[in-house]
């Protein structure tokens, strides 16, 4: 056999073995395997809850929403926790993270029961949004705790790969949860009663996540009591949560650069989300067609993110975090321009490609925080990331809602999104250059 053909055969066999090797690596890390199971169950519940809530608020014949109402709903859901998240992060860096996961999931169960009851009795939007606000805040708390705990159950040289595995598994689970919502909605209707049943179903995966969180031993998930740990009372640690988290980000250019790129991406996601929701709300069968089209767009974005989870570890090993994130931001700016025609099929394709680019940026930021931040401060920094994640989203969606017409035809905002990506690229390039060389960069 010619040498070239032999090389191709060997190369193809290596690629065929890659998923098997990753699976063996996962199963060889028992605590990571348990953590992955908690993530999968938790994010299935997240996807089901968020899709059910979106259907109840935006595609519900018993309720109606204009652009500002949509933006207001997102703000009430995410902004308060985003501002308080870094304070909660202080607790993740002081308390056994196993008990943080247990406590947060217990609180989620109580809130799920409350939100389901509010929908069942047909109460107004305010109590519904307040209940959903707290439930979603606890879900984000769980997500931050899982990310902060990962370096404790994975060897340093495998952090990037296993983080991609964890995020990919969680994304698939959330996608399945969101789409599972369509079954009870189809069976029970698109009104408040059907939405209530969907929310009550969320208790099943959250209960599983709660029980699986109990399998970890004391302090297996951290935090470590290193020399950089914040001592003093828990009240002091909570009150200074924002300060310690923000200061750590500023002191580490690799982390600051990653978060700047992530913030730019989330701003564009906010604009695109509002545009697609407004466009599909004018589909004739609003309760079915409009929601189905919106789910198709978000599913395409999620599929792109899943693909990024597969590609990013290889890209980082070949080009490093800095160059990989820069390339993703540059590609995103170009892809965004292609959606300016506001044709829904084109927007779905662009959503897929932006899902790839945006998730690459996020994974680069995640690896910087997991590898460059002291464990005693990692919870603070992940909470800051979570805050930035949602503040950027809400800020852009609120500004856009004040200016975009109700029918959603505003191509200039798509082009503005491309400019935001370019701004994020510039900031990431300048700030990232100041970072000292570290392993995995």
Swiss-Prot record:
Protein's recorded name: Uncharacterized MFS-type transporter Rv0037c
Chief site of localization: membrane
GO biological-process terms attached to the record: response to antibiotic
Compartment(s) of residence: Cell membrane
Membrane topology: Multi-pass membrane protein
Gene3D superfamilies: MFS general substrate transporter like domains
Residues that span the membrane, as ranges: 68-88, 110-130, 131-151, 164-184, 194-214, 229-246, 260-280, 287-307, 337-357, 384-404, 412-432
One Pfam family hit: MFS_1
Entry keyword Transit peptide: no
GO molecular function, one term: efflux transmembrane transporter activity
Domain of life: Bacteria
InterPro entries: MFS (IPR011701), MFS_trans_sf (IPR036259)
Keywords for the protein's UniProt record, in alphabetical order: Cell membrane, Membrane, Transmembrane, Transmembrane helix, Transport
Statement: the UniProt record of this protein carries the keyword Transport: yes
């Amino acid at each position: 056999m010619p040498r070239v053909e032999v090389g191709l055969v060997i190369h193809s066999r290596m690629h065929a073995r890659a998923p098997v090797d990753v699976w063996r690596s996962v199963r060889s890390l028992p605590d990571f395997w348990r953590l992955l199971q908690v993530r999968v169950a938790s994010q299935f519940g997240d996807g089901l809850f968020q899709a059910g809530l979106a259907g109840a608020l935006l595609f519900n014949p018993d309720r109606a929403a204009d652009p500002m109402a949509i933006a207001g709903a997102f703000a009430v859901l995410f902004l308060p926790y985003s501002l308080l998240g870094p304070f909660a992060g202080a607790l993740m860096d002081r308390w056994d993270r196993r008990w943080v996961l247990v406590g947060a999931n217990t609180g989620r169960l109580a809130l799920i029961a409350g939100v389901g009851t509010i929908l069942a009795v047909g109460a107004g939007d305010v109590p519904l949004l307040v209940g959903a606000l707290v439930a979603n805040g606890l879900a984000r708390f769980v997500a931050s705790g899982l990310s902060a705990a990962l370096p404790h159950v994975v060897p340093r040289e495998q952090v990037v790969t296993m983080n991609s595995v964890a995020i990919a598994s969680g994304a698939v689970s959330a996608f399945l949860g969101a789409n599972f919502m369509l079954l009870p909605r189809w069976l029970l209707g698109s009104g408040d009663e059907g939405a209530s049943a969907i929310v009550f179903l969320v208790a099943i995966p959250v209960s599983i996540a709660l029980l699986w969180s109990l399998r970890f031993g004391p302090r297996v998930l951290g935090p470590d009591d290193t020399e950089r740990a914040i001592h003093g009372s828990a009240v002091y640690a909570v009150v200074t949560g924002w300060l310690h988290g923000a200061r750590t980000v500023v002191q580490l250019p690799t982390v600051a650069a990653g978060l700047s790129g992530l913030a730019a991406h989330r701003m564009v996601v906010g604009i695109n989300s509002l545009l697609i929701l407004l466009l599909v709300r004018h589909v004739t069968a609003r309760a079915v067609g409009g929601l189905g089209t919106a789910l198709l767009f978000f599913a395409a974005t999620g599929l792109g993110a899943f693909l990024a989870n597969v590609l990013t570890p290889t890209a980082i090993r070949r080009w490093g975090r800095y160059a990989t994130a820069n390339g993703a931001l540059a590609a995103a700016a170009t892809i965004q321009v292609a959606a300016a025609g506001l044709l829904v099929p084109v927007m779905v394709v662009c959503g897929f490609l932006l899902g790839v680019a945006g998730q690459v940026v996020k994974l680069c930021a995640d690896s910087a925080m997991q590898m460059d931040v002291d464990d005693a401060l990692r919870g603070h920094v992940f909470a800051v990331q979570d805050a930035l994640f949602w503040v950027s989203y809400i800020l852009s969606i609120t500004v856009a809602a004040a200016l975009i017409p109700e029918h959603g035809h505003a191509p200039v905002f798509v082009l503005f999104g491309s400019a935001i990506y370019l701004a994020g690229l510039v900031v990431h390039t300048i700030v990232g250059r100041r970072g000292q060389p570290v392993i995995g960069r």
